[in-house]
């Protein structure tokens, strides 16, 4: 039987590691799957690629921090963006996609 992926726990782990570059392999290792197995499960269970899922997690948390009054520079750093402008561009892109 397939072991279920605890998506909320994976999201919490990812949030604690945003300061370092995360890739599909990092996420897959955390849930004891190969990168290709994880990619397949992510698309099936979350409806998006692992990197899309990770970006959505980062942006959701960034919006929470911004709404709480955190500055753009601090939010960008904590959410793992290279610069404040990279974060604002990502937020703008996401708003256009929804």
Language model feature labels by segment:
Residues 8-12, 16, 41-45, 70-72, ...:
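Short, charged low-complexity intrinsically disordered segments located at boundaries
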Residues 1-22, 28-31, 52-70:
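A short, Lys/Arg-enriched amphipathic alpha-helix from helix-turn-helix/homeodomain DNA-binding modules
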């Amino acid at each position: 039987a397939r072991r279920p992926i605890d998506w909320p726990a994976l999201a919490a782990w990812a949030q604690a590691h945003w300061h370092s570059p995360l890739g599909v392999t990092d996420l897959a290792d955390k849930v004891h799957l190969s990168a290709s197995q994880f990619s397949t499960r992510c698309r099936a269970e979350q409806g998006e690629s692992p990197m899309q899922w990770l970006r959505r997690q980062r942006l959701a948390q960034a919006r929470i921090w911004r709404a709480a009054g955190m500055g753009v520079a601090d939010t960008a750093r904590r959410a793992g963006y290279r610069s404040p402008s990279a974060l604002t561009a990502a937020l703008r892109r996401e708003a256009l996609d929804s």
